[in-house]
Regions:
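Post-cleavage N-terminal segment of exported redox proteins
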Residues: 1-50, 164-169, 190-218, 225-234
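Electron-transfer interface patches adjacent to heme c in soluble/periplasmic c-type cytochromes
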Residues: 15-24, 82-186, 232
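Surface-exposed patches in mature extracellular/periplasmic domains of secreted proteins
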Residues: 69, 135-140, 200-209
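A generic secondary-structure signal for well-formed alpha-helical elements
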Residues: 32-39, 64-68, 73, 77, ...
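The canonical Cys-X-X-Cys-His
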Residues: 57, 63-72, 122, 189, ...
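Charged, low-complexity, helix/coiled-coil-prone segments
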Residues: 1-13, 63-73, 95-107
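Low-complexity, proline/glycine-enriched hydrophobic segments characteristic of transmembrane helices
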Residues: 181-182, 219-222
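Electrostatic cytochrome c docking/interface patches
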Residues: 38-62, 74-81, 106, 176-179, ...
Length: 234
């Protein structure tokens, strides 16, 4: 028995209705199972939400549009993991509202920047990036050192995040004022940057035999790139 498709193919309204029905069933098949899961992505073991001061810094990061030039997503590519560390996983950003993965890198990825530079370096860099990176085209943010943190607004933000699943306790929220007393937006932004990558999975060291064999085949990054300018006599 042949199927007669003409009554659908020659009637755009009828065809549109059937397309909508088919797409709806496909969407329900994807969405309904998720509604019965308490949490699709589980947090990493021992993972805790960022502190009040770090959250204030994250708010500054969003307000100043830093995500427009910096991503927070290390892709599972060898070139990226060699530079930044372990590739990003969903559990790291399970409490991020909104997520800041980004889509453009005018500047480097920041997903693993925590601990790579000192607080003083970040302070100078945020005030005037060219003081530490002469070729940088990043704008400075000197006003961050003048603006104090609004503890009441931050506490309200933490309560809102708790309704979305971030496990802030009453003690965390009550301690917001003490945690941010006398702190500037510069302090908060630095604290946030230092928190990035805190729970990143660690890269496993290659077995000794494999590492030796690999070193015979491929020069190590250290053998190709001087560790400092002194090594090249500049």
């Amino acid at each position: 028995m042949s199927l007669n498709h003409e009554k659908f193919e020659k009637n755009i309204l009828r065809m549109g209705i059937w397309i909508a029905i088919v797409v709806s069933f496909g969407g329900l098949a994807q969405i309904v199972p998720l509604m019965f899961q308490a949490q699709v992505v589980e947090p990493l073991p021992d993972m805790k939400p960022i502190t009040a001061l770090e959250l204030a810094g994250r708010e500054v990061y969003v307000r100043e549009g830093c995500y427009n030039c910096h991503s927070q997503m290390v892709r599972a590519l060898r070139s990226e993991t060699a530079r930044y560390g372990h590739h990003s996983i969903a559990a790291e950003s399970v409490w991020d509202h909104p997520f800041l993965w980004g889509s453009k890198r005018t500047g480097p990825d920041l997903a693993r920047v925590g601990g790579r530079y000192s607080d003083d370096w970040h302070r100078v860099h945020l005030n005037n990036p060219r003081d530490v990176v002469p070729e940088s085209n990043m704008p400075g943010f000197p006003w961050l050192s003048e603006n104090l943190i609004d503890a009441d607004d931050l506490a309200a933000k933490m309560r809102a995040l708790r309704t979305l699943g971030t496990p802030y306790t009453d003690e965390d929220i009550a301690g917001t004022s003490a945690a941010t007393q006398g702190k500037t937006e510069m302090d908060a932004t630095i604290a946030y940057l230092q928190s990035l990558g805190r729970y990143a999975p660690k890269r496993q060291a290659a077995p000794a035999a494999d590492a030796t064999a690999a070193s015979d085949r491929v020069p190590s990054p250290e053998s190709r790139v001087p560790a400092s300018t002194e090594e090249v006599g500049t």
